[in-house]
């Protein structure tokens, strides 16, 4: 599995159910990488998508203990059930796309994290684990410093150390 996430300087990812940032280059990268792949998310992340609908051109799996059946979505009620669902997945990559609790629960099952680091510190109430403080992770590659609408950011790929 691969986690894909945009974080603030303090590893914040969201506030009040919304993303902290809307960066076109980041969204384009997300679409390019995840299209025709499997994406795993929590119930609140699904509800935050446009119309609360699953992402098109992807296999959408929601990890939730209390989600009702929804068209276009497979539901896993536990990590064990999720792992069984994706065991024979033909997708080249399986992406974990949030939110905070799902990232924390599935990070031990990820071999890579594709991170957009935004050099800003808006208030957040959902966070991604600090990979720089975790010796199990190391930076594999990073882009040059980019800027869009006054926000400076980098694409940083982490792999297990």
Describe the role of every protein-language-model region.
Residues 1-161:
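Enzymes that bind and transform nitrogen-containing heteroaromatic metabolites
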């Amino acid at each position: 599995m691969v986690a894909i996430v945009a974080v603030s300087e303090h590893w914040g990812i969201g506030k009040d159910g919304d993303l902290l940032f809307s960066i076109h280059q980041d969204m384009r990268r997300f679409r390019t990488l995840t299209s025709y792949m499997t994406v795993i998310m929590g119930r609140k992340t699904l509800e935050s998508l446009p119309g609360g609908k699953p992402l098109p051109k992807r296999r959408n799996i929601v990890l939730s203990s209390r989600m009702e059946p929804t068209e276009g979505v497979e539901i896993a009620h536990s990590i064990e059930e999720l792992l069984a669902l994706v065991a024979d997945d033909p997708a080249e990559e399986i992406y974990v796309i949030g939110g905070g609790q799902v990232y924390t629960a599935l990070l031990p099952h990820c071999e890579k994290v594709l991170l957009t680091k935004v050099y800003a510190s808006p208030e957040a109430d959902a966070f991604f684990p600090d990979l720089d403080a975790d010796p199990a992770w190391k930076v594999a590659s990073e882009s040059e410093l980019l800027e869009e609408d006054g926000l400076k950011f980098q694409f940083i790929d982490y792999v297990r150390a």
